[in-house]
Amino acid sequence: MPRARVHVIPTSAPDDMSGLQTLIEEKNLDPARLVAILGKTEGNGCVNDFTRAFSVAAIQRVLGNATENVALVMSGGTEGGLSPHLVTFEALDETGNGPSMAMGATITRDLSPSEIGTFTQVECVAEAVRSAVRSALISDSDDVHFVQIKCPLLTSDRIATSDAPTVTNDTLKSMGLSRGASSLGVALGLG
C-alpha cells in the first residue's frame, strides 16, 4: 500500500510559519508531495473568524504554487485544551508491506451560494470522495477510516449576490446545513 508522512507543527500565531519553513529547509517536508494541511487557529470559530484566511495566506506565501492542489483546512478556536498548530500530510512514492496510511485528496468546483446545503452539494462531495479514494489507490471503501471536509458557508455578501434563492439567509445556520450536506456526501461517496 502507498505510504504517507504527517507532521504536527505548533504555531504561536495564525501567520507563524517558522516550523513549516524549518521542516522544508531541513528537507524533512517536500512541498511537492503535500496533499493537505489542516490547522487550528486562535480565532473564534464563527463565520467572521478572519484567522483562518490569515493562516491560509501565510501558508501560501511560504509554499507559493505548491499549494495549488493542496487542501488547506483551517479551523478557528483554541479554547480549552487545544493549542494552535498545523498538521501537514504528504503522500510518498514509497510502498510498505501490509497496511499503511494512504491519502488522497480532491478539491471540488466552487459551489454557488444557492447550492450550499443542498443535494447538489451532497452529490458534489460524494464524487469528490470517490475521486480521493481512487487517488489514494484504495480499492475497498472499508479501508477508508477518515474523511476531512472543508465545506463552504454562506456569508452576507454571498447571500446578497446570489443569482438564485439560498437555503437560508442565516449565516450561522448555513454552517450546519453545509456540514450536513458534506456529511451526507461522504456517506454516499463511500457507499
Stretch-by-stretch model annotation:
Residues 1-191:
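Terminal domain-initiation and capping elements
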